[in-house]
């Protein structure tokens, strides 16, 4: 079944109809040499095993063989999850530990995603863009090339509340720490959003906005460019 993931209602339907998953990993001290483990991934022998699979299948193996198990420890990080994480091995970018990136996200060459950042389904990150620590990009949020999304900043998604138009951030935009870009807002290339701003309306190219709600306070000049320049070495 195909879904139009540019539409918030289609994204919601995709999530609703996706097979929910509760994967677990279990370390077992015991004799599982005769256990039926065809439907899971497992490693080990001689009294020690690692089991990986859906929680209901693992639970059945543990219960069926409890008389042969001395100890076990279970690890679990999600419950009835609808969307898997992005396969980072296919990404030509720097992704730091602790970033949470859902499947069906596009990340450009030499982009950087820092610790604690969260990027939801359908988001697009341009070449050379940095998503700083604890920043959030909602479903279908679009960031252009060489953008800096500051620590703790939020780019709203198209899901709750549903919005046909995603947030769109142009190229070479700097968004300061803890700023919020509301649903459907477009920010023109080369603009700067001051830290802590709440942007509720579209921003033209080449301006500086600040405040809540954010207002244009000046044009981007050489002094502003000097204060907001990006470092290429961080993207190598």
Swiss-Prot record:
Q: What is its EC number?
A: 2.3.1.89
- Matching InterPro entries: DapH (IPR019873), DapH_N (IPR013710), Hexapep (IPR001451), Hexapep_transf_CS (IPR018357), Trans_hexapeptide_repeat (IPR050179), Trimer_LpxA-like_sf (IPR011004)
Q: Which UniProt keywords apply?
A: Acyltransferase, Amino-acid biosynthesis, Diaminopimelate biosynthesis, Lysine biosynthesis, Repeat, Transferase
Catalyses which reaction(s): (S)-2,3,4,5-tetrahydrodipicolinate + acetyl-CoA + H2O = L-2-acetamido-6-oxoheptanedioate + CoA
Keyword field contains tRNA-binding: no
**PROSITE patterns per the record?**
HEXAPEP_TRANSFERASES
Q: In which pathway does it act?
A: Amino-acid biosynthesis; L-lysine biosynthesis via DAP pathway; LL-2,6-diaminopimelate from (S)-tetrahydrodipicolinate (acetylase route): step 1/3
Q: Any idea which GO molecular function terms this record carries?
A: tetrahydrodipicolinate N-acetyltransferase activity
An example GO BP is:
diaminopimelate biosynthetic process
Pfam families according to UniProt: DapH_N, Hexapep
The keyword Flavoprotein belongs to this UniProt entry's keyword annotation: no
Family from the record: Belongs to the transferase hexapeptide repeat family. DapH subfamily.
Q: Which HAMAP family match?
A: DapH (MF_01691)
Described purpose of this protein according to its UniProt entry: Catalyzes the transfer of an acetyl group from acetyl-CoA to tetrahydrodipicolinate.
What is the name attached to this protein's record? 2,3,4,5-tetrahydropyridine-2,6-dicarboxylate N-acetyltransferase
Q: Which species?
A: Clostridium botulinum (strain Eklund 17B / Type B)
Q: Which gene encodes it?
A: dapH
